[in-house]
Amino acid sequence: MRTSLIAAGALLALAINVAGARAATPEETSLRDELRRLAERLERVEKRNAALEAQLKTYADRPARSQGEIEARIKALESYNKRLEDALADEGISEREPELASRLKAVEYNTLDIKKQATVIDSIEGFAAGASFTSVGQRATSVDTNGTTLNYRADITVTTPTVKTGDIESKLFGHFRVGQGRGISQNLTSFAGPNVSSFQLGTAIPAENSALLLAQAYYRADIPLPFGGFKPQSREKLTINFGKMDPFAFFDQNAAANDETRQFLASPFVHNALLDNPLAANVGADGFGFSPGVRVAYRNERTKSEPWGLSFAMFGAGRGANFSEGFRSPFWIGQAETTQRFGGLTGNYRAFLWRNGQAPTFLRDPANLDEALLRPHRGGGLNFDQRFGDYITYFGRLGWASGEGLPFDRALALGAEIGGSYWSRGGDALGIAFGANRSSEAFRNTSAQVVDAAGTPVFGFAARGSERVAEVYYRFRVHQNFEISPDFQLIREAAGNPAARPVKVIGIRLQLNQ
């Protein structure tokens, strides 16, 4: 190519010289100028070609010169990979290993930590826990000894996750309780206990000490009916509980008068007075209100807004209530309940029958006059709570019993809980209740003759008529987890004593829950 460019340039110069030997015409002059420009462009192209050839030679020689550098880089990369593999094979982290290995190990450890945390979360998922603290201070008039008392009680509950076995759902429930203070009942002879929230572990434990009690621990299984049917369409259920339980958690419930930590404090307005009272509680539980047993319940929700149910249970009584002996002469109870609506307002109605083969009495055991004589008792009760208006719930309890040594054999309680929305305090409530407990004929005839081992009269009066009880409380909600409740009670003719002065009990309750 370079030779052809030189020949073209020579011919161009020759043509220019020939044209210059004679006088040039204008066309020849223009042609000569054009040829000159072409010659200059050819010269520049030649120089550019020479430069490109030089660069091409340089690039052609470069791989041969850098081959050694590439081999060195490959060896360095192989060495780095070997160090990285060795570092990853060791679980430890060293400052001498490649940074990439350290970072990979750090990511791996963080991932393992996250997995461990997820495992812990999975292991506790489904657990439910609750805690509450209740403290009550009361002052009573017309009592012979100290009329001012203070007590506290703390409750912790835990429910395990639901375990499904086919269509059957089961879980465990645990309840721990601790407290101090026995309340005014220890200084007052009455069919009604002014403070159901009082609790202290054992009479032998000094009052300055406190101990934790496993109050409840039981198993629950819910079985949809019919057994083996299609669960999503089931409207019937069978529930089985067994273990250590509070019988009142399953029987004699009431929406307006059931919780001594938030509602009424006096025992006739918390439970049926014949089953729970300071003198001779027929419920058959231990000294703290709990006993081992088994319960079977049937619930029918074919009419969703008005379900009904039947339940039956057997609990330990006497020494069997505290596991000192087996289920000899236990406490039996059966209950029928239904939910009804009147004018769109919900009401719950219950009827129950019970029998205690070894219930405590007001009589003394001839073998030990300091101990109560145990005798079979039987009875029944009615219970209702009915909404009235938007924020009022009425309640009522009626009880009757028969058997030897009953201090009273009839019990009646009526009252209402009024929601604070009527005075723009939706979280508050006002409770009002009245009750009467009729002394039994046996108690009226023999109460004055009952003495203890030292010959001291246990009651010291001849009973007659009925004990009458009234209570008013106001529950003031400070915030969602804290409530303060001033409380007033009036007891007339306590334990049927016609000579007893009216007992006025003023108190205040603090309630914390979580």
Residue ranges of predicted features:
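Repeated loop/turn-to-beta-strand initiation elements of outer-membrane beta-barrel proteins
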Residues: K164-L172, P226-F227, T303-L310, F342-Y349, ...
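Outer-membrane beta-barrel pore domains and translocons
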Residues: T134-Q138, R177-G179, G243-P247, R299, ...
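Residue-level signature of outer-membrane beta-barrel architecture
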Residues: D122, T160-K164, A221-I223, K244, ...
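Membrane-embedded beta-strands of outer-membrane beta-barrel proteins
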Residues: I156, A217, V294-V296, G334-A336, ...
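Outer membrane beta-barrel transmembrane domains
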Residues: E337, R350-L374, R378-D385, F395-R397, ...
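N-terminal periplasmic/intermembrane-space "pro-region" immediately following the signal or transit peptide
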Residues: G20-G147, P161-I168, P232-Q233
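Outer-membrane beta-barrel "beta-signal"
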Residues: P502-Q514
